[in-house]
């Protein structure tokens, strides 16, 4: 009877030891997984910060491009306005030139 009890206790001890080893292995795996997740979290955090900075940089660039676009549109309107006025101004200058040419020829003829 004592031998049977001894064997039973030894088997229970062996099972308990095996269970403890399984638990230790599980704890080791969980710690490795935790470390991996922490590493992933750190990388995602760095990526998020980088993306936030990129967004700020792009917003500044968009603002700059919008300002340049507005300036160029103003210059385009001015050029279009000048192009509209140019033919009338050219006609006026041609008439002025003709008047001066007639006056010059008149002066030459009177000499």
UniProtKB/Swiss-Prot annotation:
<comment type="similarity">
    <text>Belongs to the rootletin family.</text>
</comment>
<keyword id="KW-0175">Coiled coil</keyword>
<protein>
    <recommendedName>
        <fullName>Putative ciliary rootlet coiled-coil protein-like 1 protein</fullName>
    </recommendedName>
</protein>
<feature type="coiled-coil region">
    <location>
        <begin position="21"/>
        <end position="86"/>
    </location>
</feature>
